[in-house]
């Protein structure tokens, strides 16, 4: 019997999301206008909390839908105006271009990245050195490329290798159901479990590597570009401004990688089983033997385009998004991708997040119009200039660990910029706060998948169920990194940021810019 129209409407509303989640969103949408009519400031904070809730529940429903409904309602009831939202979007156009074009551009360099990570995995036999290499490679790539793309490539390598061994273990060469272990013998099942542990640890090291590298440069994370634009920094200066915090954090992060592997802590330390290595090596040898000259030339072309990307970013030859567009044009031209649909696939990864970021800017417009963060900023600015840095770092870190760090970084840098424009803080102090905001937004956010988009991408990927990587296990495996990165970052903000920055200014490495 066919269901009623009411039941059909309920099922269509937010699709497969749990009923309690749908009900919660409906309550939000009913309550917000009522509260706004009585107490606009309270309603504004209610909206922010609700929006953070949708980000935290990203596994129940992609936040674009519920967050978008909340943003539309905020516009309809007058919490902000379409004109203000347009201003926010226009002011952050570079970030949208970064997400649209740079991520799509790197998509056409995936063959090269797959080649690099495959060579690492099979070329390094020591698990400690392999983990360090994956972490370092992910960090380096994330400093210039989008972290999501780097993680996507590592996922592709892991799924490919898992599938190769799973088919051998199941004695079914054509089996595509990688989740089904029922027909695998006990011995192979034990080896497969070890292989899962090995892949879990590598994926987590690579994920943390993207955070370590992503915090260092203005293109490493979307919020970095927003912060760099607010402070008037280019690529080189951004790196030097962050270096007093990010370089010690990088060293301590890599030491953590070695320690958890050596002492097999927090689920790390599982080596690659010899039988699996043998199977993978044989497969790779066959693949390399079959590689044509055309495929080799594609890899060389992608490597040269990678060099162009790094040089163009380092010397700020154009806006980041336009450099990404040049990568799309060069990569498609020299790898022979000419079909419109094949090119279109490159944009599917980034556009949902680009749309979500546009919704972020709507919420930011509400925060500005309703002056929601004014009491928080006034409280922080009452402290001494030195204490302000630690407070900004901690406030950012706390919110970024449960919410999306792009949203948090955007809100706080806007508030700091407003304080500068109103004369509440000096220009040198604003620059220090920008460093504290950027590092506070990026480093503690490794605590949960909600904070790091790359972690959330990994958790929702096809690989996660294959290697038994759940939300809880991811938080547990990230814990040593969370503690080390957060504490070392805080200590550096507290003790090394100001003296090292003063030294760089005194020796002409940095200059105080004229703000845009």
Curated annotation (Swiss-Prot):
Q: Name one Pfam family in it.
A: NhaB
Recorded superkingdom: Bacteria
List the subcellular locations: Cell inner membrane
Reaction equation(s) it catalyzes: 2 Na(+)(in) + 3 H(+)(out) = 2 Na(+)(out) + 3 H(+)(in)
**Which of UniProt's keywords are assigned here?**
Antiport, Cell inner membrane, Cell membrane, Ion transport, Membrane, Sodium, Sodium transport, Transmembrane, Transmembrane helix, Transport
Keyword Transport listed: yes
- Transmembrane stretches, by residue range? 23-43, 61-80, 97-117, 120-140, 144-164, 202-222, 238-258, 303-323, 348-368, 391-411, 447-467, 475-495
Q: Which InterPro entries match?
A: Na+/H+_antiporter_NhaB
Topology with regard to the membrane? Multi-pass membrane protein
Q: Does the keyword Cell membrane apply?
A: yes
Can you quote a single GO CC term?
A: plasma membrane
Report the main location listed first in the record: membrane
Q: GO: which molecular function terms? A: sodium:proton antiporter activity
Q: What does this protein do?
A: Na(+)/H(+) antiporter that extrudes sodium in exchange for external protons.
Q: Which family does it belong to?
A: Belongs to the NhaB Na(+)/H(+) (TC 2.A.34) antiporter family.
Provide the protein name: Na(+)/H(+) antiporter NhaB
Q: Which organism is it from?
A: Klebsiella pneumoniae subsp. pneumoniae (strain ATCC 700721 / MGH 78578)
- The UniProt gene name for this protein comes to nhaB
């Amino acid at each position: 019997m066919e269901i009623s129209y009411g039941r059909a409407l309920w099922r269509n509303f937010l699709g497969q999301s749990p009923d309690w989640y749908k009900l919660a969103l409906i309550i939000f949408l009913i309550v917000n206008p009522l509260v706004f009519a009585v107490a606009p400031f309270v309603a504004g904070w209610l909206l922010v909390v609700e929006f953070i809730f949708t980000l935290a529940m990203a596994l129940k429903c992609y936040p674009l839908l519920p967050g978008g409904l909340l943003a539309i309602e905020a516009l309809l009831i007058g919490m902000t105006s379409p004109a203000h939202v347009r201003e926010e979007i226009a002011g952050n156009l570079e970030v949208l271009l970064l997400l649209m074009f740079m991520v799509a551009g790197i998509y056409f360099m995936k063959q090269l990245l797959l080649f690099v990570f495959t060579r690492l995995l099979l070329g390094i036999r020591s698990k400690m050195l392999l983990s360090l290499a994956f972490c370092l490679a992910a960090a380096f790539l994330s400093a210039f490329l989008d972290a999501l793309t780097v993680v996507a490539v590592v996922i592709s390598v892991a799924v490919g290798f898992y599938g190769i061994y799973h088919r051998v273990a199941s004695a079914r060469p054509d089996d595509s159901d990688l989740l089904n272990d029922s027909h695998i013998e006990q011995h192979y099942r034990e080896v497969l479990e070890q292989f899962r542990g090995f892949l879990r640890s590598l994926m987590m090291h690579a994920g943390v590597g993207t955070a370590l590298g992503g915090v260092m440069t203005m293109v490493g994370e979307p919020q970095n570009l927003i912060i760099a634009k607010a402070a008037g920094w280019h690529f080189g200066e951004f790196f030097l401004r962050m270096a007093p915090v990010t370089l010690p954090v990088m060293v301590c992060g890599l030491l953590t990688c070695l320690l958890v592997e050596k002492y097999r802590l927090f689920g790390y330390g599982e080596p690659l089983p010899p039988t699996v290595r043998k199977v993978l090596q044989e497969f790779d040898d066959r693949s390399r033997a079959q590689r044509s000259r055309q495929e080799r030339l594609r890899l060389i072309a992608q490597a040269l385009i990678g060099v162009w990307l790094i040089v163009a970013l380092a010397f700020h030859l154009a806006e980041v998004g336009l450099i990404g567009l040049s990568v799309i044009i060069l990569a498609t031209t020299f790898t022979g991708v000419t079909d419109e649909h094949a090119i279109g696939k490159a944009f599917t990864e980034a556009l949902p997040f680009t749309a979500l970021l546009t919704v972020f800017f709507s919420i930011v417009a509400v925060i500005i119009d309703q002056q929601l963060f004014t009491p928080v900023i006034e409280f922080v600015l009452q402290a001494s200039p030195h204490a302000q840095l630690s407070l900004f770092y901690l406030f950012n870190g706390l919110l970024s660990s449960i919410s999306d760090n792009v949203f948090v970084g955007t809100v706080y840098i806007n508030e700091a910029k407003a304080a500068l424009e109103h004369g509440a803080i000096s220009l040198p102090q604003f620059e220090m706060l920008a460093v504290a905001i950027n590092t506070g937004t990026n480093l503690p956010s490794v605590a949960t998948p909600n904070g790091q988009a790359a972690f959330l991408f990994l958790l929702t990927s096809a690989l996660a169920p294959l290697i038994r990587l759940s939300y809880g296990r991811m938080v547990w495996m990230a814990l040593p990194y969370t503690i080390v990165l957060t504490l070392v970052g805080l200590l550096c903000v507290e003790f090394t940021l100001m003296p090292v920055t003063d030294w760089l200014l005194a020796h002409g490495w940095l200059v105080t810019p004229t703000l845009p």
